Amino acid sequence: MKASGTLREYKVVGRCLPTPKCHTPPLYRMRIFAPNHVVAKSRFWYFVSQLKKMKKSSGEIVYCGQVFEKSPLRVKNFGIWLRYDSRSGTHNMYREYRDLTTAGAVTQCYRDMGARHRARAHSIQIMKVEEIAASKCRRPAVKQFHDSKIKFPLPHRVLRRQHKPRFTTKRPNTFF
């Protein structure tokens, strides 16, 4: 999978094709994060074939639809449990992100894993994504924003204007 652009959350439901032995095969549902519905269906078959004796040729997708965030204007903390294949083996990991949407947090996770661990999107498997309360957060990078009186410093910028002289009679004002 290529994690291009912002990923979307899909709910994919599939099952085996009905046979004379089993008239109503059980349905399997998955939350898949993918750039589009075609990739979401493909990932569903990839994961389901690992878990159950099921293949695309002997199964069908019953439903595939995008899941939209309930409150996309509220900043939330997300905990993401994942496994990924590195050059030395397979690792489990728990990560925390702050974002407006679940899909945004997962996209952030894919970018972060690529930057910090050189993990490509195809080698990352998201196992669970959960919205977590501020009191349950563990990572200091997320906890630092849980202050109600948070302040951000104004940068001390020195503007270099191109067509102004380098030396002048008055001091520059760099406090904005």
From Swiss-Prot:
**Annotated cross-link Glycyl lysine isopeptide (Lys-Gly) (interchain with G-Cter in SUMO2) - which positions?**
11, 128, 170
Do the record's keywords include Mitochondrion? no
Alphabetical UniProt keywords: Cytoplasm, Isopeptide bond, Phosphoprotein, Ribonucleoprotein, Ribosomal protein, Ubl conjugation
Which GO biological process entries does UniProt record here?
Answer: cytoplasmic translation; translation
Q: Which domain of life is it from?
A: Eukaryota
According to its record, what are the GO cellular component terms?
cytoplasm; cytosol; cytosolic large ribosomal subunit; cytosolic ribosome; membrane; postsynaptic density
Coiled-coil residues: none
Q: Does the keyword Phosphoprotein apply?
A: yes
Q: Name one GO molecular function term.
A: structural constituent of ribosome
Places the protein is found: Cytoplasm
Q: Which Gene3D superfamilies match?
A: 3.10.20.10
Q: List-wise, which residues carry N6-succinyllysine?
A: 76
For this UniProt entry, what is the primary localization, expressed as one broad class? cytoplasm
Q: Which residues carry this modification: Phosphoserine?
A: 71, 123
Q: Which residues carry this modification: Phosphotyrosine?
A: 63
State whether it acts alone or in a complex, and with which partners, per the record. Component of the large ribosomal subunit. Binds IPO9 with high affinity.
Xref: PANTHER family:
60S RIBOSOMAL PROTEIN L18A (PTHR10052)
The record's similarity note reads: Belongs to the eukaryotic ribosomal protein eL20 family.
Q: Which HAMAP family match?
A: Ribosomal_eL20
| Record's function text | Component of the large ribosomal subunit. The ribosome is a large ribonucleoprotein complex responsible for the synthesis of proteins in the cell.
- The protein here is known as Large ribosomal subunit protein eL20
Name of the coding gene: RPL18A
